[in-house]
Amino acid sequence: MLGWPPDGPTLRLDYRRFSYAGKFVMSNTGKAVVREADEATDREYDDAVLAAVAFNDDRTDPSALWLRYVTVRDDRRGEGLGPRLCRRVVAEATDRGYERTRIAVNNPFAYEALHRAGFGFTGETTGLAELVLERPVDRPAERDPGAYRAGLDRFRARDLSAAETEFLERKRDVDPPRE
C-alpha cells in the first residue's frame, strides 16, 4: 500500500507498458501496488511495479470505496495480479470502516478479472457506459450467473476487438468465475 487518498501518493508508470499510466501521477487517489521483489528503481518510471490500483472514497456514499483504475504491466497480464491486488485493497478497506467496494469497468477482460476478485455486476452503468461491479468488503459478492451473463451480453452489443469477441464467445453460457 503506497497510501490512502489523504496521503497524496503518486506513482510514475511507463505509459508504454501500463494502461492508464497517467492516472497514477495524480495525488487525489490512494494507491496500492504489486512490485517485483528486490527490484530497485531510480529511473524515470517505477520499473519494479507489476500492477497498480488507484482508489478513493465514494463522494455520495461514505460507506463505499471506489477502485478507480487497475493496471497490470503488459508482460504480466493474465497472471492474476490485478484480482489479487484488488482483494488486498478490499481487505484493507475493511479495517478503515468501509462496507462495500465498487468499480466501473469498460472491457470484458476487466469484467472477468474483477469477478475473480469477488465483485459482482450490479446491473448499473456509468455515464461512460462502464459496467458497475460491487462487493461487500467482508466477503465476496453473491455469485449470480444471470447477472454475470447479462454483463457479458452488454459487452457483446459493442464494437469490440477480435480478442474481446473471441473471449466473449468462450464465456457464452458459463457461470461466473470463483474468487
Region annotations inferred by a language model:
Residues 12-52:
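Conserved beta-hairpin
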Residues 42-64, 70:
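A conserved beta-strand-loop-helix scaffold within acyl/acetyltransferase catalytic domains
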Residues 57-68, 77, 96-99, 127-129:
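A conserved beta-turn-beta hairpin within the catalytic core of GNAT-like acetyltransferases
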Residues 72, 78-91, 116:
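Conserved acetyl-CoA-binding loop-helix of GNAT-fold acetyltransferases
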Residues 106-129:
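Conserved active-site alpha-helix within GNAT-family acetyltransferase domains
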Residues 127-179:
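C-terminal "cap" of GNAT-fold acetyltransferases
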